[in-house]
């Protein structure tokens, strides 16, 4: 996830250049796999939305997806849960040391699964937080959105 405070360019909004605007941009940052989320990504998204919700000088949130994909140049908002890590027990948390390694072999990946968190992909908790946030959450959709990504788009304002 990326989390940025928007900054004025000082042109048409009558705000001096470089001054913080009351808007936060939160973006999925896994463009190579259409911004699919993993359990750690869902945790980060929850923390980002909650931080913006609790910051008094933030008036709105923009939720989007980074891109383009280095594989084919395509853009995506979010393709939902990363099916490559979904096991028989559900989605699997990985240890921090392997969570960003896209090329780790499946057998090696299994050694790093956090056993106490098997099956836990709590996107519903993020959706509840989005609905309870009194600030508008704008879904800026740059391309594909499917599965859980589509649900986030629908829940946004």
Question: Which residues fall in each region the model found?
Answer:
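Conserved CoA-thioester-binding segment of acyl-CoA-metabolizing enzymes
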Residues: 1-71
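Glycine- (often His-adjacent) and acidic-residue-rich active-site loop
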Residues: 33, 65-125, 145
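Short, well-ordered alpha-helical scaffold segments within catalytic/effector domains
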Residues: 42, 46, 120-127
């Amino acid at each position: 996830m990326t989390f940025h405070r928007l900054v004025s360019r000082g042109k048409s909004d009558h705000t001096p250049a470089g001054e913080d605007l009351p808007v936060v941009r939160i973006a999925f940052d896994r463009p190579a796999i259409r911004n699919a989320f993993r359990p750690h990504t869902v945790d980060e998204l929850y923390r980002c939305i909650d931080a913006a919700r609790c910051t008094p000088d933030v008036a709105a949130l923009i939720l989007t997806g980074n891109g383009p994909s280095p594989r084919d140049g395509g853009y995506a908002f979010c393709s939902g849960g990363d099916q490559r890590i979904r096991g028989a027990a559900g989605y699997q948390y990985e240890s921090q040391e392997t969570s960003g390694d896209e090329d780790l072999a499946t057998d090696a990946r299994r050694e790093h699964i956090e056993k106490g968190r098997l099956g836990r992909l709590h996107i519903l908790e993020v959706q509840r937080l989005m609905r309870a946030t009194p600030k508008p959450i704008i879904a800026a959709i740059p391309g594909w959105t499917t599965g859980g990504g589509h649900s986030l788009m629908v829940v946004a304002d």
